[in-house]
């Protein structure tokens, strides 16, 4: 997961060592603002948000869903967000039931890209080898293209 957590103390003060005496120099401090953290994180394709005195950065990937009738929906998904949740936020209507990876209602098949679906328990190794994915427990690990509505193909 591409998340970086920085405590407020490490963001606001850095202590330098003197090269000649190897003693701590505590009278100098350097500030790193959340604003500059956001700017730098965007250059690496990360989103940054402030939270309780720190900053959190997540990678963001493009996910394209290909529906059974040829419709295409593309939206951004953070690497710590399930694809189904992001689809709903983007206004995409997908089938689901358990939201826990314990059934096959939300099944899709990966055309390209990688996901982490270690939270799921329903799919067998043979399904995973064929690229099947449960969108309710799948975190993107790259840009992805996924065919949706694949539950009937699992049986």
UniProtKB/Swiss-Prot annotation:
TM region positions: none
Keywords carried by this UniProt record: 2Fe-2S, Acetylation, Chloroplast, Electron transport, Iron, Iron-sulfur, Metal-binding, Plastid, Transit peptide, Transport
Signal peptide: none
Induction: By nitrate.
Chain sites annotated for binding [2Fe-2S] cluster: 98, 103, 106, 136
Subcellular location: Plastid, Chloroplast
PROSITE patterns referenced in this protein's UniProt entry, alphabetically: 2FE2S_FER_1, 2FE2S_FER_2
2Fe-2S ferredoxin-type domain location: 61-152
Record-stated family: Belongs to the 2Fe2S plant-type ferredoxin family.
Protein's UniProt name: Ferredoxin-3, chloroplastic
């Amino acid at each position: 997961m591409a998340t970086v957590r920085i405590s407020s103390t490490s963001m606001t003060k850095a202590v330098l060592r003197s090269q000649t005496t190897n003693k701590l120099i505590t009278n100098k401090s350097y500030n790193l603002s959340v604003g500059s953290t956001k700017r730098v994180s965007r250059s690496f394709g990360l989103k940054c948000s402030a939270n309780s005195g720190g900053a959190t950065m997540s990678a963001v990937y493009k996910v394209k869903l290909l529906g059974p009738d040829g419709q295409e929906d593309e939206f951004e998904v953070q690497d710590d967000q399930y694809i189904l949740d992001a689809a709903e936020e983007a206004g995409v209507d997908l089938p689901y039931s358990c939201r826990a990876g314990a059934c096959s209602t939300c099944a899709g098949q990966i055309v390209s890209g990688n996901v982490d679906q270690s939270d799921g328990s329903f799919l067998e190794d043979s399904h995973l080898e064929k690229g099947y994915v449960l969108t309710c427990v799948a975190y993107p690990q790259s840009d992805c293209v996924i065919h949706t509505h694949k539950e009937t193909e699992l049986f």
